[in-house]
C-alpha cells in the first residue's frame, strides 16, 4: 500500500524531554506515556517518508512552506538539552511532487531551500520520541500559513495525492498544542473559551467530525490561544477518502496549556 499509511498528532512542550524537564516532565507523564505508545504504533508502519508539520516552522501568511533542500538539522540546545544537533535527509522528490500538485490545485506554496535549515522545537520534541520509529527515513518539514482553514485541509489532500503518485508510504505527523489559556497560570492567562475549544476539538477528532472543525468560529479559535489547529487540518486533509481509526491516546492541560496525543490508523482490507 502506498500513500498515507499513518497519521498522528503530537504536542511539543520541551520539558517532555527529560534532559530539559529535569524532573518537571513528571507533570506531563500522561503525555509522555502516550508518546511512547505512539512511537510503538508508528514503528509498525514502516514508512518510506515522514511529513512533519510544525506551528513554529518558518511560516508565511499567504503560502505553505515546504523544505526543498536535501537535508536539515535540529537540536534542543536553546532549551537546555546538550545533545548534538541531528542531521536529517529530506525527501526532495516527494517535496517537489507536493509543490507541483499544490500548484495544480491552486494552493500557493513556497520553497524553503536553505542548506542550513534548522528544525524548531515543534519538530524536535515529537522526534525525541518518534525518531527511533522512523530511523533512516527522510522527513519533509512543512510550515502552514494563515490562509483559510479549508485551504489547509485541501493542502492535506494535495500531500495525500502526491504520496500516491510517487508510490511512497508516508506517515504524517502534525505537531501542535491546544489552548494556551486553560488557567491563570498559563502563558497567556485564562479565557473561558480555552477549555471550550479543547473539549470541542478533542471530541471532534475522536469522532472525525471534520465539518465541525472546519466551521469553528474565528472568535473561539482566537480566544483559545491555540497553535495546532492548522497542522491538524493538514493531517486530516491528507487522510481524506481513507477509512481511518481515530484514537485520542491522551489529553491533559498542565501549566494552562492543552496537550493531546492522537493516532490515525488506516483500516485496510475493508
Show which residues each predicted segment covers:
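Structural motif
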Residues: 42, 164-165
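Catalytic metal-binding/acid-base residues of hydrolase active sites
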Residues: 56-58, 178-179
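Short, catalytically relevant binding-site loops at active-site mouths
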Residues: 147-149, 178-181
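Short conserved catalytic/interaction loops centered on acidic-Pro-aromatic/His motifs
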Residues: 170, 181-185
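Short gly/pro-enriched beta-turn/loop segments at secondary-structure junctions
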Residues: 134-137, 165-169, 175-176, 257
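Non-transmembrane, aqueous-exposed alpha-helical and coiled segments at domain scale
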Residues: 157-164, 170
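Flexible, D/E/H-enriched segments
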Residues: 1-48, 59-157, 186-270
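Beta-strand elements within well-structured catalytic alpha/beta cores of enzymes
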Residues: 8, 48-54, 142, 168-176
